[in-house]
Amino acid sequence: MNFHPELSKISQVTNNIFLSGVFPMEQDPTVIKKLNIKYILACLDRQYVSDAHNAVLIDNPECTILYLPYDDDVSQNLWCKNKNTINLVKYTRTMEEYNCLYKQFQMYQNKPMIEIGYHFINNAVESGNNILIHCMAGISRSVSTLTYYLMKKYNIPYSQAIKYVKDRRSIVNPNDSFKLQLQGYQSKKENFIESDGKKVTDFFKYGQSRLK
């Protein structure tokens, strides 16, 4: 089986935004500190990357990690609401830091997970900090979340946003359900909600006849 070289690479997408899978951190946990990354948006369940992230946090204790537990599956609704499913992790040294982190965690309750991702990315970028967005391979889940950020932030269509990312990381390829959900957002903008995402996932689960 061929191993694409980009799987072991952290790709720089903008001045502050980086994209990858977990492999670069497994190979070298110090790479996060070397790239001056202060925020990590992990678009997968924490259990799959806990060892790699623990090593990162030991080397870079100022880093904040947000976990959006997405599955790379056509049944995954990117707009599903957070019902105590996300994790927000940071080594806090003072009660003030802890309270700030807890306030942020509470603010994310009952919000669409992709919107939480947008907020987390935007906060990092607006504060001038570097952020890594990753999933297992840096191909589908993390790419979809980043593409949504670009679409919303710059009011651009899906095709333009995904091309921008693909020009900087050639292996990107969101699954078909994620593509349709993002294209649905393109059509409806902020009116695209969790039930719209469910229509897309139901299409793949049941077929078009069940959507009528």
Curated annotation (Swiss-Prot):
GO terms for molecular function: MAP kinase tyrosine phosphatase activity; MAP kinase tyrosine/serine/threonine phosphatase activity; protein tyrosine/threonine phosphatase activity. Signal peptide: none annotated. GO terms for biological process: negative regulation of MAPK cascade. InterPro entries: Dual-sp_phosphatase_cat-dom, Prot-tyrosine_phosphatase-like, Tyr_Pase_dom, TYR_PHOSPHATASE_DUAL_dom. It is an enzyme of class 3 (hydrolase). Its EC number is 3.1.3.48. Residues 9-191 form the Tyrosine-protein phosphatase domain. It catalyses: O-phospho-L-tyrosyl-[protein] + H2O = L-tyrosyl-[protein] + phosphate. PROSITE patterns: TYR_PHOSPHATASE_2 (PS50056), TYR_PHOSPHATASE_DUAL (PS50054). It comes from the Viruses. Pfam families: DSPc. Keywords: Hydrolase, Protein phosphatase. The active site is at C135 (phosphocysteine intermediate). Belongs to the protein-tyrosine phosphatase family. Non-receptor class dual specificity subfamily. This is Putative tyrosine-protein phosphatase R622. It comes from Acanthamoeba polyphaga mimivirus (APMV).
